[in-house]
């Protein structure tokens, strides 16, 4: 009998310990979600909307600090592939997200469609020599700014538009390629380019440019913003909570205020 009693004690102690550890793990997971730093790598075209959304999230979750790393989606994708410590990634096209997913770098089940955009042709405010895409071939138009198609989704969409309109080959010598869509906007604002191709939301935030034309929807791939948690996130619970907020009603309201078309899955 003493042996049996001893055996029962030996069995009970590990079970109790396991339960305690499980409770502690669950508690720590919730604590990390509520108190943490998160790194968000996102397409720079989202800057103004994300600034406001991050602020709103901080008000509701004062223990969380979201650090934004903004740039061209292709550049951010390569940073992640090279091991950059990122918790959440938002790209301006499916291509970059697909590449990361194919390499197993996304946390399974976290990928979300967030918003849509459109592609527009802009000129410096007050310019009258350009009234549409076809005017870009005029000799007076010397420089046309667009994103680098290999790394900037906005540049890839711009290339698709010009190709669809049978203008790309004629305009190659005039193209000024930028590192991201906000640099395109700056080139046009400062009149270092006669025209530029950006997202509608970029044009909306600047009083220094005018929208001359919107690219036909069938002239380019859909402009789709997607978000996902990275598999190597040090705090997946916190990252998931922020991504859920991005897909929620409050964030949708901000996206729509800045001209994005939101998606309700």
Please give the residue ranges for each predicted region.
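Exported/periplasmic ABC-transporter solute-binding proteins
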Residues: 13, 26-61, 65-70, 74-84, ...
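Bacterial N-terminal signal peptides that target proteins for export
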Residues: 3-18, 27
